Amino acid sequence: ENRQIPLIKNIIQASDLKVQTGGGVRSVEDVEKLLHEGASRAVIGSLAVKDQDTTQTIFKKFGAECICLATDVLPQNGEYMIAVSGWQEGSAVTINDLIEGYLDVGLKHILCTDISRDGTLGGPNIDLYKTVKNDFADIQIQASGGVSSLDDLKVLNTDGIIIGKALYEDLFTVEQALEAAAC
């Protein structure tokens, strides 16, 4: 099991930025390692669906400020269904069910990806983020999937935005993105 902890540590040490990291987080010990190396927040995805007891233990041990739930969704029949295991498996859990399951342990942060739009440059799923924000006004939402333009950043009413392919394709710069998102 290669968790890339040394690489994550190097990234954290090379920057004054807060670093949120995840991928393959499956235990209390995994979260402990990430936070010990200086990550400000650990992202938990599949574990939150597959093992709610362990995930709640993580929230209680480290505090909600240090945990972000990855809510990777696929729109299906008017619902946003959670996908797990690197998007390889569907689940019977809706995004609302997942969020509601962690409110009692203080859930504050979600990274919400519409996986049908991720990497497509097809624009973000504005309705998804509006719905989640309306249903859970106190949750900090990081939007992910489909960002293709600076206009996308201006219309997303979320607390953070994940940008991938648009930067790789040089559609705009990080500086331009920060300026657009600040509007």
Labelled PLM ranges:
Residues Q4-L7, I11, D30, D51:
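Generic hydrophobic, aliphatic-rich segments that mediate packing or membrane embedding
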Residues I8-Q13, L35, Q56-G63, L103, ...:
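Surface-exposed amphipathic alpha-helices with a cationic face
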Residues S15, V19-Q20, V25-R41, D127-I161:
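Catalytic cores of alpha/beta
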Residues K33-T54, D114-R117, G145-S149, T158-A177:
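Glycine-rich phosphate-binding active-site loops on the catalytic face of alpha/beta enzymes
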Residues T55-I58, N125, L153:
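Distinct, well-ordered alpha-helical segments
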